[in-house]
Amino acid sequence: VSGLKTVIPSTPYDAKGLLIAAIEDNDPVIFFEPKRIYNGPFDGHHDRPVKPWKAHPLGEVEPGHYTVPFGKAVIHREGSAVTVLAYGTMVHVCEAAAEESGVDAEVIDLRTLLPLDLETIVESVRKTGRCVVVHEATLTSGFGAELAALVQAECFYHLEAPVTRICGWDTPYPYVHEWSYFPGPARIAAALTGIMEA
């Protein structure tokens, strides 16, 4: 749909700022709320309690009016070895995976899928030479395919390894086996380690 903007926040601060921006925007906006992060920044470890938002630097929501601009990604974790592109819940899972793997990964929170901050993505991938795209949707027809294609087109001569996608499996969502379907920190850490060896 022409003009449709797509928003997926990963923090309470961004959720408020992006929602106000969506309300004030003249075009239609689809606003996704990742339920897994309602109680705190879920890091993908379903067997541990979630740390509350009050312990997170972006958990506090400023009183009053403010907006977060569409099409402006934010780097949640600086790094120089590999660029990780994520949104929503996956931002926190990727941060945990980077810490656990010991890979110097730069984790970028896209915040909005349309418009997309291609400038931040390209700058990071040209710096690191590697890119891992992570999302919860299926591998086939997921937004990660578009991200991988854009990175390939814009950064081809800077890539030291193929773009890697870590996503849900190409199956209907299996509620009984949710945690084997969900791209958890172990799968992401393995991808980070693997792309460094490529």
Stretches with model-predicted labels:
Residues V1-D25, G168, A191, M196:
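Conserved thiamine diphosphate
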Residues G3, N26-D27, G102, G129:
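Residue-level detector of structured alpha->beta connecting loops
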Residues K35-A198:
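Thiamine diphosphate
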